[in-house]
């Protein structure tokens, strides 16, 4: 293990200990089903905004968006309005209404909320919605664990299987221990870390590579083409398909249940500003990082570009 790897390893251990501490603290705050499932409906704007943003973006943003920008070049710019539209849909249309109705109906889960009608609860709808959520989450969680496994594998040389089991064990421990409070606070910490990464690393990369070199690299591409340079209907189809990312945001139950947990509608209005500012920092930052990487490093795995550039440009911690 190199000196740099040792620093990264001890930083990771410290982070895991913080997560366990959050779980222990949250377990003392959890005294009822309402506390466990939606934090007693007491989430403030900062925790709600940052935890919802981080859980909606997580690994696919850090690794996927930067990797797409590295691989695609200029056409990756469309990821930004696509994701930002998802934030607007969630925070301006879904969040206020869901918060108000879930409070008035005293529902704890999204499945329970969806199953309610004027004539009471529809059992079949609750079962169906629960099945859909569980089925889709199998693939979503698998992709998150795979991303974590890739990070461990490339940084420490550990097997992906061991890395996934280790990470899953920590997550399972603090989640079962502290419930929604633990998840929300750990996601808030993740959101802050992501924002710092999206500010610091692209700035350092830009300083290293130079803005002129980035412009020269992507300048030959068209805004209205596919990543392979095809224009016309194919380019329009690519743009529309990419913009479709925003439609998926209201369909993420682990995100919209934050809206149910926010203390009041007024706090929703405050949280939406924080969340949108966060998105404006994160997505352009990751796109810029990917563009800088095209002129700085050669990688067969485009999704590793953030990790590779971080290892080369930043101190180990």
What are these regions (language model features)?
Residues 1-62, 175-178, 191, 197-203, ...:
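Membrane-interface "cap" regions at the ends of multi-pass membrane proteins
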Residues 2-4, 38-43, 64-81, 115, ...:
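Loop-to-helix junctions at membrane interfaces in multi-pass transport proteins
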Residues 3-27, 43, 68-112, 194, ...:
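Extracellular loop-to-transmembrane helix junctions
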Residues 18-33, 89-111, 145, 173, ...:
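Juxtamembrane interface elements at the cytosolic ends of transmembrane helices
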Residues 21-22, 26-29, 91, 95, ...:
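Hydrophobic alpha-helical segments and their helix-loop junctions in multi-pass secondary transporters
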Residues 37-54, 96, 100-135, 263-266, ...:
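Transmembrane-helix boundary/entry motifs in multi-pass membrane transporters
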Residues 68-72, 97, 147-155, 168-191, ...:
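Membrane-water interface regions at transmembrane-helix termini and the short interhelical loops
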Residues 78-175, 241-248, 294:
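Helix-loop-helix module between adjacent transmembrane segments
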């Amino acid at each position: 293990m190199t000196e740099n790897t040792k620093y990264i390893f001890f930083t990771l251990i410290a982070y895991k200990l913080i997560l366990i501490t959050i779980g222990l603290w949250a377990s003392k705050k959890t005294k009822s089903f309402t506390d466990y499932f939606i934090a007693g409906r007491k989430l403030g704007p900062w925790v709600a905004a940052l935890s919802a943003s981080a859980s909606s973006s997580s690994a696919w943003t850090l690794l996927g968006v930067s990797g797409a920008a590295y691989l695609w070049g200029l056409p990756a710019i469309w990821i930004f309005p696509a994701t930002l539209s998802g934030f607007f849909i969630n925070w301006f249309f879904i969040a206020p209404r869901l918060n108000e109705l879930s409070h008035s109906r005293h529902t704890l889960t999204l499945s329970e909320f969806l199953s309610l009608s004027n004539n009471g609860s529809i059992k079949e709808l609750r079962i169906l919605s629960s099945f859909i959520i569980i089925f889709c989450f199998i693939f979503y969680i698998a992709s998150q664990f795979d991303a974590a496994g890739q990070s461990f594998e490339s940084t420490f040389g550990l097997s992906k299987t061991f890395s996934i089991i280790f990470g899953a064990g920590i997550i399972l421990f603090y989640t079962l221990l502290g419930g929604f409070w633990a998840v929300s606070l750990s996601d808030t910490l993740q959101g802050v870390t992501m924002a710092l990464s999206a500010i610091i690393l692209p700035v350092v990369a830009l300083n290293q590579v130079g803005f002129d070199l980035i412009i020269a690299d992507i300048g030959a591409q068209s805004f209205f083409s596919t990543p392979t340079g095809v224009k016309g209907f194919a380019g329009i189809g690519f743009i529309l398909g990419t913009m479709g990312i925003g439609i998926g945001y209201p369909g993420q139950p682990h995100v919209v249940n934050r809206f149910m947990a926010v203390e009041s509608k007024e706090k929703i209005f405050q949280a939406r500003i924080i969340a949108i500012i966060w998105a404006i920092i994160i997505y352009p930052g990751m796109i810029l990082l990917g563009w800088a990487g095209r002129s700085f490093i050669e990688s067969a795995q485009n999704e590793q570009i953030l990790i590779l550039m971080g290892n080369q440009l930043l101190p180990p911690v």
